[in-house]
Regions:
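A structural signal for short, hydrophobic/glycine-enriched beta-strand patches
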Residues: 2-151
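A transmembrane-helix-recognition feature enriched in membrane-embedded lipid enzymes
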Residues: 147-167
Length: 168
């Protein structure tokens, strides 16, 4: 599901979608997304990423703050990480992040989405409903039983996203 283009064609607007945090650190699913992001940032030293995710009712910190801290603690330059800390779902992740990207002067017509493999299809679909041309950088899900569980959950979430796009 990695559909990145040549380095000079990679979208300027890059968003890492949040996932649940555990205490003051990322969950396994989120850690895999962040590790994928770190590799991308090493390969594309001119790119800035937006980490997107608010604070769930059972979370002590915003997903964005946990993601930013993880990236910086693992070698990312803080000046290359922008936090979007209000989103509570995938649509808001993309919408709120695009507003931050636009304010920072990035072209938001194309977006590189970093998320889990099971989540990529729906994330790209939602980006298209927001008039963005999406590209994906997917992290793997392991163990396989988690992938099965999350993929089944995504079927229903995708149906909901499709319905919302059609009916507001």
């Amino acid at each position: 599901q990695d559909s990145i283009m040549a380095q000079d064609e990679t979208p300027a607007f890059i968003v890492v979608l949040g996932a649940q945090v555990q205490g003051d650190g990322p969950s396994l699913t989120l850690k895999k997304r962040l590790d994928k992001t770190l590799t991308f940032m090493q390969e594309h030293p001119d790119k800035t990423v937006i980490v997107s995710g608010g604070q769930g009712p059972d979370e002590a910190y915003t997903e964005a703050s946990v993601m930013a801290r993880y990236l910086i603690e693992h070698g990312a330059d803080a000046s290359r990480v922008i936090e979007e800390d209000k989103a509570s779902n995938t649509r808001e992740n993309l919408l709120f992040s695009s507003k931050l990207a636009e304010a920072a002067g990035f072209d938001t017509s194309r977006v590189l989405i970093v998320t889990s493999d099971f989540h990529m299809c729906r994330a790209k679909y939602i980006a298209r409903t927001l008039s963005m041309e999406p590209y994906g950088l997917a992290s793997d899900t392991w163990p396989w039983i988690l992938k099965v569980n999350y993929t089944l959950r995504e079927v229903f979430a995708f149906a909901k996203a499709f319905w919302q796009a059609r009916h507001g």
